[in-house]
Each structure stands twice: as C-alpha cells, then as structure tokens.
Amino acid sequence: MGVFSNLRGPKIGLTHEELPVVANGSTSSSSSPSSFKRKVSTFLPICVALVVIIEIGFLCRLDNASLVDTLTHFFTKSSSDLKVGSGIEKCQEWLERVDSVTYSRDFTKDPIFISGSNKDFKSCSVDCVMGFTSDKKPDAAFGLSHQPGTLSIIRSMESAQYYQENNLAQARRKGYDIVMTTSLSSDVPVGYFSWAEYDIMAPVQPKTEKALAAAFISNCAARNFRLQALEALMKTNVKIDSYGGCHRNRDGSVEKVEALKHYKFSLAFENTNEEDYVTEKFFQSLVAGSVPVVVGAPNIEEFAPSPDSFLHIKQMDDVKAVAKKMKYLADNPDAYNQTLRWKHEGPSDSFKALIDMAAVHSSCRLCIFVATRIREQEEKSPEFKRRPCKCTRGSETVYHLYVRERGRFDMESIFLKDGNLTLEALESAVLAKFMSLRYEPIWKKERPASLRGDGKLRVHGIYPIGLTQRQALYNFKFEGNSSLSTHIQRNPCPKFEVVFV
C-alpha cells in the first residue's frame, strides 16, 4: 500500500544498459541517456509527492492507535495483508484474517497433561490427558509439585472449617496454583450438584407421614449448632422423625430420598456454616419434593430453585420463627404448595445457570483452565504477534471481540462498532453469532427434558474470561454501557464467556 511500497519499485539511477533497446542495437533516436535522466529527475519528485499525499489522506482516517498498528503491520506484512483501506475487504473480514493466531502449542497434537489422577470424564473441548506416569512433563499435578513449570493443584469437597488447607487463602500460601473446592470463588469449583446425579424435577409425591419433618444426622459433634437446632425444634412440638445416629426415633435402614418424599419438610442440616458448602442434604430434599429446612451455608438462597423453596435457620434465635412457619405451611395446603411451585413452573434462571456448570466435568474444566492459562501467558510474551484488534474506515471503528460458552475452550469472533459499544449490542452480537452456528448449549443433553427450552438461546450473563464463578454468577456486572466501552477499548481483542439458559 501507499508510499513505502511504491518507493521500493523503480530504481533512481538507471544505467545505459537498462534503457530501452531498438532492433538495430542502438538507443532510441528520440532521446539520449542524458535527456532521459533529466526527465526522470524532473518527474520523480512529483510522483513521490502525489503518492505521499494519497498515503497521508488514508492514514489520517485512522485513529492514533490504528496508525501505530497500521505502520507496524506494514513493516511485517506484505501489501496483500493491508487491503482494508482499499475497500477490497470489509473491516470484519480483515480483522478475522489479520487477528488470527497460530499458537506455538497445538493441544490436538500436544494435549494438556495433568498428573496425579486418572481421567474421569468422557470428553472435553480441549485435548487433555490425565494419569500417574508419563515421559512428558506435566502441565499441572495434584499435590504440591516442586517441578518448575508445573502447576500445583489441590482438590477437595470437604469443608475448610475441618480441613484448613481447603481455605482459598491458606491454599495459596501453601503454594497451590489451582484450587478446586466447593467454594465458587475457587479456580475450578467442585460442587455437590449436577443434573446427572439428582433428578431435581422429579414429581412431588403425597405427604403421607404424620411427622412434619425427617432428619438424617449422624455426626453429633458438628462444629455448628445443628444438633441444638434439632433439639430446639423438637421442643416446639414440631414432630420430627430422626433416622440418623443423633436422637434416632425411627429405623435408619431406609433409602433416604424415597423416605423424604413422604415428608413435608426435610432437615438439611450441614455440619458447618460455610459459604457455598451445600451438600447432598439440600439437593436430595429438592429431589424428594420435601421443603428443606436449612442450617448451613449463609448464602443458601443462591443455591435454591426459588426464593420461597426453603426455610433457613441462620442462628438459634430463628428456631421459633421457623417452627411457626413450618406449622403454618403444614396447615395451609395452598401456601405449602407455593413452596413447591418451582417443580411445576421450573426453577429460576440463576439456579439453572449454577447447576449447568456441572454439565462439564470438573476435571475437564480443570483442563480448560490450564490450557487457557497457557494461552494467556503466550499472549503476554514480547514475541507474540501484535494484532490490530480494531479497524477504522472513515469515521467508524469496528472492534474485534472473542467469546465462548462457559465450559468450552475455543473462541468465536464477534464485532462491535464504536457507536454501539453497549450491553444490548454485545448480547445481540453473541446471540447472532451462536445462532448462525446453530449452536447447542453444553447443558442441552444434561438437563431434564422439561427444562431444555424451545431451542432458542437466552443469555444469562456475559463476563470477561478469568473471573471466578462467584464473580460471574453473582458479583460481576458492567456498570452500564460506558463501563463495557472502556473495557473493550483498554483490552485489545477482549475475551468473554457467555452463560446460556
């Protein structure tokens, strides 16, 4: 393009041998070598000036950042790579081409290797090998690894109040690079929930038991007040059938979920009150259609299918009020049925977004986390290809963004114009892209049939890659269009994840 490429073409000092030759071997009679040189000397500056003017006119249409990128790419790319200014390609097509990257590591040929655990998933969107022995250096390993370049992983589903190393800050101090716990703030959460494990939408059964609630509590030395809460409820004349080792009054040799189906309430009492520590006690109650009465996670509402689907004893002072509520619901069928309405109408989008996370096995999510980290490190290196990430034509600038569904590895391109860097435009661009691909969400085959929808994609959230699931699902939100615009302009080729519901 323009001035530099044209200056590389003609040579300034032409020799006698380079002049046109007539058939008889003499030079053209119309001009001598000296007159030709004079003509070249006369017209060459004019030609150069014209080309410079044209070039400046083109470059002035770019903003400053685009000017730097254009000049950088000019010196590293052939003229065929810079046709966007000539109108041969649209900005989107040009960006798709010049922003493309061939990374130094092809995971299809050189898969992620995780050491210290057997592979426990069928498929994953990034090639990944797990095992105990290999000639290859691991990308990550369970336990504290002292091998340089290998990430150390801790994985546990136990409460941090019983196992201090599961505390996120403690794990970091010990040297773990990747934390996998029940905490949604961990790098790769490993929760007790999933569509595959629990038939959450199972129909409600008749409540035939005389007792209001059932309890299955065997650890009578829990580090919270659950045993005291059980005793206090019994003293309020709430009849409870206890199948566990604590205050047992019923034969414990029953199938738990089947037994719970016939009680109006289930005591989902955890052994600790810890954020995000929500175990099978709660989810089995949902399966059974027995309203869970919770002692446990202070943020239990984030794990509930609807706001009125549970009762929460946050502290001992709440016992009397909860007991009163249980009796009221038991005596008022319409009010009680409201607590189970989600079974018929479907749970909230936030609940579906949470459970959908488990549609991708935690080990696969670990592999994606490691692969993403490897790519990010390469992109930060000085040797990494510089990409324009935006294109300006006239007064309009087009920005190149990348997006993937949560649980996938590969990215898809979307584009936004500078006059429309809005949250609405971002969502529309994401939907348009994935709908054009006839994309099927990860959870499609995992959810119960009644929750798979009508085939139309709906966005629950879009967030920058790198956030924890706590941030992505509950805490993060762009503060209006200006916040999104600033993020896009400050982060060339920004990457996002989308959660579909």
From Swiss-Prot:
Pathway: Protein modification; protein glycosylation. Keywords: Cell wall biogenesis/degradation, Glycoprotein, Glycosyltransferase, Golgi apparatus, Magnesium, Manganese, Membrane, Metal-binding, Signal-anchor, Transferase, Transmembrane, Transmembrane helix. It catalyses: N(4)-{beta-D-GlcNAc-(1->2)-alpha-D-Man-(1->3)-[beta-D-GlcNAc-(1->2)-alpha-D-Man-(1->6)]-beta-D-Man-(1->4)-beta-D-GlcNAc-(1->4)-beta-D-GlcNAc}-L-asparaginyl-[protein] + GDP-beta-L-fucose = N(4)-{beta-D-GlcNAc-(1->2)-alpha-D-Man-(1->3)-[beta-D-GlcNAc-(1->2)-alpha-D-Man-(1->6)]-beta-D-Man-(1->4)-beta-D-GlcNAc-(1->4)-[alpha-L-Fuc(1->3)]-beta-D-GlcNAc}-L-asparaginyl-[protein] + GDP + H(+). Residues 1-39 are cytoplasmic. Its main location: Golgi. It is a single-pass type II membrane protein. Changing S218A: Loss of catalytic activity. Its cofactor is Mg(2+); Mn(2+). The record marks S218, N219, R226, Y243 as: May be important for donor substrate binding. Glycans are attached at N64, N337, N420, N481. It holds the Pfam family Glyco_transf_10. One of its GO terms (molecular function) is glycoprotein 3-alpha-L-fucosyltransferase activity. SUPFAM superfamilies: UDP-Glycosyltransferase/glycogen phosphorylase. Its EC number is 2.4.1.214. The C-terminus (388-501) is important for catalytic activity or for enzyme stability. The N-terminus (1-89) appears to be dispensable for enzymatic activity. Belongs to the glycosyltransferase 10 family. This is Glycoprotein 3-alpha-L-fucosyltransferase A. The gene is FUT11.
